[in-house]
Design a protein with these regions (language model features):
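Tandem-repeat/low-complexity and Cys-motif detector
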Residues: 183, 209-212, 240-245, 272-276
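N-terminal, post-signal-peptide segments of secreted/periplasmic proteins
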Residues: 1-189, 195-207, 214, 228-233, ...
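A detector of tandem-repeat and repeat-rich interaction/domain scaffolds
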Residues: 188-190, 220-222, 228, 251-253, ...
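Short acidic-hydrophobic sequence patches enriched in Asp/Glu that either
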Residues: 223, 247, 287, 310
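Short, solvent-exposed linear patches
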Residues: 278-281
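Generic alpha-helical hydrophobic packing signal
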Residues: 187, 191, 212-213, 219, ...
Length: 396
């Protein structure tokens, strides 16, 4: 029987039965029924760090709650399978995976040690580590991929998972990417990719930290400390975006190649951020407060824009202590300016400003003289940066 009433997720439901004698008269009443906890049809609560998925019914969220298997618990693996098998409400509202693990924190985290790769996510889902009651300002749900196999990814947002959110997880020690995205309009916020749950120990992932492979309009990070991702210690790139369908992505407010304080060297093995040929309209940083990324300690380039990738604004970022150039268009070293800026290429090989002098009073005022030789009748935003140490290339 479907009843209409306002009941919160987790409230306990019980009942009595009373003989109806008719005419508004009633007879004997029973005791209270065995209670059951109310569940929201699109919310699954993970309550164990176990990676077990045997014996349970993962054919739907409702089926999983009815049959959790012999351990009586719901693992993250079971939750993802059940969410994949449950149609989104109204065809659009994502299922949600929450956490309520009763065990004490060990090393500041509830660590889920995976024996194999988690299932790919096949439809919209919100995996929200911040729902765990132990959550403070940093993740307490950690996914450890050290035992999952060399090709395992941490989270794989596959085709069909458009509109998903991954929030508040530490994802480390996977053989492949920490997060791999092939779908659109996903939000990745508040995750520590490649560190422990407190963001103080570099653990890395075997390929890229975050890999957008054809996905469009994804948002990585945000303008607040809560939304900031740490992406560190990857064998390859911190963030890589590839394929011409990867249009309109935004990379905002992240710490890339460093720790939670933004000071330690947790550098990625290649580039901090890499945009491959065909990628357009991917915004790295921004003009609003908090949107700039910190990109540091890369073994390669800070930000690399390659091939035919163009119309990719890079704004308001702190780019420092990288082995290669801070920004490298075409990934070939410093590109000389050309008269009129007519040459094509990565970000249209936009000419850089030429600074002829910079005079400071040592406290509050600096006078900068310079010019930019570029496309006529076009408005430009010129950003200035200062550092106590010059880039070895003299550019940056």
């Amino acid at each position: 029987e479907a009843l209409s009433a306002a009941v919160a997720n987790g409230e306990f439901i019980t009942a009595t039965a009373t003989v109806n004698l008719g005419g508004g008269n009633f007879g004997d009443t029973s005791e209270f029924a065995l209670n059951t906890a109310a569940t929201v049809t699109n919310i699954i609560v993970v309550d164990t760090t176990s990676d077990d998925a045997t014996g349970s019914d993962t054919s739907s969220i409702a089926a999983l709650y009815a049959n959790k298997g012999a351990d009586g618990k719901i693992s993250l693996r079971e939750a993802i399978i059940a969410a994949n098998n449950t149609a989104n409400i109204d065809g659009s509202t994502p299922d949600e995976i929450h956490f309520a693990i009763p065990d004490a924190l060990i090393g500041g985290a509830h660590t889920i040690s995976l024996a194999s790769a988690l299932p790919s996510i096949l439809q919209a889902v919100i995996i929200d580590g911040s729902t765990e009651s132990d959550f403070g300002s940093t993740p307490v749900i950690a996914l450890d991929g050290s035992g999952a196999g060399g090709s395992a990814r941490g989270i794989h947002l596959n085709t069909g998972s458009d509109g998903s959110t991954i929030r508040g997880l530490a994802i480390h020690s996977f053989g492949d990417d920490g997060i791999h995205i092939v779908s659109d309009e996903n939000t990745i916020i508040g995750n520590f990719v490649g560190t422990n749950a407190s963001g103080t120990v570099e653990l890395g992932n075997g390929d890229d930290g975050i890999h957008i492979n054809g996905g469009a309009n994804n948002v990585i990070g945000g303008s607040t400390a809560t939304d900031r991702n740490i992406i560190a210690g990857s064998t390859s790139d911190g963030i890589i975006v590839q394929l011409s369908t990867s249009d309109g992505n935004a990379i905002l407010g992240n710490y890339i190649g460093t720790d939670v304080t933004g000071t330690l060297d947790f550098g990625n093995g290649a580039e901090g951020i890499r945009l491959l040929t065909g990628v357009e309209n991917t915004r790295i940083g921004g003009t609003a407060a908090g949107e700039g990324n910190l990109i540091a300690f890369s073994s390669g380039i800070g930000i690399s824009v390659e091939g035919s990738a163009d119309s990719n604004p890079i704004l308001g970022n702190v780019i420092r202590s990288n082995i290669g150039l801070g920004i490298d268009l075409a990934r070939d070293g410093v590109t000389s300016n050309d008269v009129g800026d007519a040459d094509p290429g990565s970000n249209n090989l936009q000419n850089f400003p030429v600074i002829t002098s910079a005079v400071t009073d040592g406290s509050s005022t600096i006078t900068i003289d310079g010019s930019i030789n570029t496309t006529a009748s076009t408005t430009y935003r010129v950003e200035f940066f200062s550092s106590t140490v010059a880039d070895p290339s003299a550019y940056g």
